[in-house]
Amino acid sequence: NARWNLVEQAWSMGISRNLVGVEFDEDNQLLFTRVNARRVDITSCRDSLNGYQKGRCFYCFKPISLVPGDAELADVDHFIPWAARQEVSNINGVWNLVLACRCCNRGVEGKSARIPELRLLQRLHTRNEYFIQSKLPLHETIVLQTGQRPEARKSFLQRNWQAALDKLIHTWKPNAEGEATF
């Protein structure tokens, strides 16, 4: 029933059901999401993610836009890169998605398939906790994807970050483009 509620909520918010499809692992007693090993459309969550980022790139704080066709249209980025999808649980989960400027996501000096440095993982944890505490519609999804307690959620992020780092090896640090706002 909780899984169906998440899907209904996603539809009402215009978010792709692929971002909140929750399955149950009987052996490990875990809820998880998976869409085979293929990419799914994750751009439907721009507006929801912007509730925290308030028009700024998650990495460098440069102003971003949510208007389709705008030169500064935000990319929806996998914080832990898609390239680590075999090592990371539910890579398309909302817990792992952030809004990024094009330079940070795919520019010459951008993140691409590198792992954001550890201090940015703390920023992601803070962002996820914000969604959970604010009781915004994404809060239940993030709890189901990452854990019931803050310690479990932090451990989930750390485990996945380390698994991705073990595979991809290289970390990345953004250049500040604006004042830190979150």
What does each model-identified segment do?
Residues 61, 102-105:
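Cys/His-coordinated zinc-binding microdomains
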Residues 56, 97-100:
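Short pre-active-site segment immediately N-terminal to redox-active cysteine/selenocysteine motifs
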Residues 14, 21, 51, 55, ...:
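Residue-identity detector for glycine
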Residues 2-63, 83-91:
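Short, charged surface segments at domain edges that flank catalytic/cofactor-binding sites
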Residues 1-34, 112-182:
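Extended charged
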Residues 61-97, 110-123:
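Histidine-centered nuclease catalytic patch
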